[in-house]
């Protein structure tokens, strides 16, 4: 359905027949769609890949006798059968909607998914556009859920945007609590088509992205977040979907105020500056920030964002002083005038700048 609706949206604008090569198998993990070499380079699949090499001699006899109940979920299977044979066909690009079967393996997913994109481009000999869908919300809503595996997988997907000629359409706001495959495929396809129409087919007037976090600053109990374009708050009067990490490492719900059309302040009932802020970080998040073209602001976490400016206050770094300031690596002052001997005592695990030195807290 998604591929059909995507093609239909392109046809409305291009007014020419759209060719779609549908190569998909439900319930498969990302590693099923990459080459042996890519899976081996990413790591984590050694036992299966070694078995492949050992069984190659007797492969036909083994498969005829018992292919295995979950053979379609094995590394490289769909790649070998459903992707590699297509490499002789010229294509304009690829769209991808997958990830549910990799939830829980979020750290591995980032290099795996990037490897897939590079792998496919290599065998086609073409740096074609690769547009993909960020997973929809799923399961029962939880207001403060920093350990969400679904949110972590979405973040791993988002990291693929670091590759050239990629784009992501989020489905985070069209999910259903009890259906891992939500029915609103038309909206997801529309968002994918906006990416293709603007970046592949040259419709430069199309808005294909929501506002992005441009800068932030942390002060006592408060974060101020500035976005790249005006925001629209839907459903209720105030922004929602934010959680804050307190100086003790605990996460709490953030109370939000819209300062102007592109700036939000988030506050909490704790003492000190927050360590980080996350937006739409849950299995089934309820964030309500949108931009033009009804596109939702993507989930984010300030503690893992490159290229976003943060306000760094004047920090005491002189190691000869009796006290020092303690700062996170993304510039948040978490302690002022702390004694050298106990500067990081009680802080969450991570790397901090204590005075003029980096310190690892375990």
Regions found by a protein language model. Give the residues of each.
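C-terminal outer-membrane/trafficking sorting elements
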Residues: 309-362
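Cell-envelope and extracellular/periplasmic
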Residues: 1-308
């Amino acid at each position: 359905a998604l591929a059909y609706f995507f093609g239909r949206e392109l046809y409305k604008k291009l007014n020419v027949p759209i060719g779609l090569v549908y190569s998909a198998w439900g319930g498969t993990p990302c590693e099923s769609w990459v080459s042996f070499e890519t899976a081996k380079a990413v790591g984590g699949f050694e036992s299966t890949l070694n078995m492949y090499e050992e069984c190659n001699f007797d492969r036909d006899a083994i498969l005829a006798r018992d292919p295995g109940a979950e053979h379609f979920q094995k590394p490289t299977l769909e790649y070998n059968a459903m992707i590699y044979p297509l490499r002789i066909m010229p294509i304009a690009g690829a769209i991808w909607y997958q990830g549910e079967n990799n939830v829980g393996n979020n750290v591995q997913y980032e290099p795996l998914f990037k490897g897939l994109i590079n792998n496919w481009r290599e065998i086609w000999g073409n740096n074609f556009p690769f547009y993909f869908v960020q997973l929809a919300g799923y399961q029962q809503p939880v207001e403060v859920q920093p350990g969400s595996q679904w949110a972590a997988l979405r973040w791993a997907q988002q990291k693929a945007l670091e590759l050239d000629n990629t784009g992501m359409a989020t489905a985070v706001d069209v999910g259903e609590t009890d259906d891992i495959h939500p029915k609103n495929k038309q909206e997801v396809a529309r968002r994918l088509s906006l990416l293709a129409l603007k970046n592949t087919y040259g419709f430069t007037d199309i808005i294909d992205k929501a506002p992005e976090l441009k800068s932030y600053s942390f002060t006592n109990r408060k974060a101020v977040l500035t976005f790249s374009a005006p925001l629209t708050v839907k459903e209720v009067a105030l922004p929602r979907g934010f959680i804050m990490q307190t100086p003790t490492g605990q996460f709490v719900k953030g109370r939000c105020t819209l300062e102007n059309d592109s700036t939000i302040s988030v506050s909490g009932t704790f003492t000190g500056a927050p360590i980080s802020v996350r937006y739409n970080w849950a299995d089934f998040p309820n964030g309500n920030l949108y931009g033009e073209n009804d596109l939702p602001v993507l989930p984010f976490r300030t503690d893992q964002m490159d290229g976003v400016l943060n306000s760094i206050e004047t920090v005491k770094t002189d190691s000869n002083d009796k006290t020092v300031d303690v700062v996170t690596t993304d510039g948040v002052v978490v302690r002022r005038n702390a004694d050298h001997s106990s500067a990081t005592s009680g802080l969450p695990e991570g790397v901090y700048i204590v005075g003029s030195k980096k310190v690892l807290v375990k």
